């Protein structure tokens, strides 16, 4: 823990940290639950956490009610392990679900679960367009 805190101590401005369970290629290679990580997450000196949920599922959102209120969340709403491009409606429903569980004040960002490095560029571009369309649909734009 100390090394992580030390690594973040020199950063000015907003500090974000991405965490996922490493399901490379869609295969879950690490087991665990977000609730088990709450003591660790509550000790981190970060402004917001960037988390995967689209692939993993949203069943554990309740665990984040135990997160320090000043730590905001980035919620993954686009599955980067699948070539299928989500519809705007699917993404809007994922956002709505997260907001219903955690409240709008906790969610700072919606984003893909992780990076798109495994996907063809054309798929990644369409997924990003779907993310924008889903966010806009959720916001009623």
Language-model segment annotations:
Residues 3-141:
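Domain-level signal for soluble alpha/beta catalytic cores
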């Amino acid at each position: 823990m100390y090394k992580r805190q030390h690594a973040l101590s020199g950063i000015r401005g907003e500090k974000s940290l991405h965490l996922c369970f490493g399901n490379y290629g869609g295969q879950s290679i690490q087991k665990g639950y977000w609730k088990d990580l709450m003591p660790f997450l509550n000790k981190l000196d970060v402004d917001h956490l960037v988390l995967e949920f689209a692939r993993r599922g949203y069943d554990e959102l309740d665990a984040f009610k135990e997160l320090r209120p000043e730590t905001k969340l980035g919620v993954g709403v686009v599955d980067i392990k699948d070539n299928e491009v989500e519809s705007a409606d699917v993404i809007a429903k994922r956002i709505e679900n997260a907001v219903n569980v955690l409240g709008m004040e906790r969610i700072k960002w919606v984003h893909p679960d992780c990076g798109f490095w495994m996907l063809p560029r054309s798929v990644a571009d369409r997924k990003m367009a779907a993310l924008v369309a889903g966010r806009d649909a959720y916001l009623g734009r």
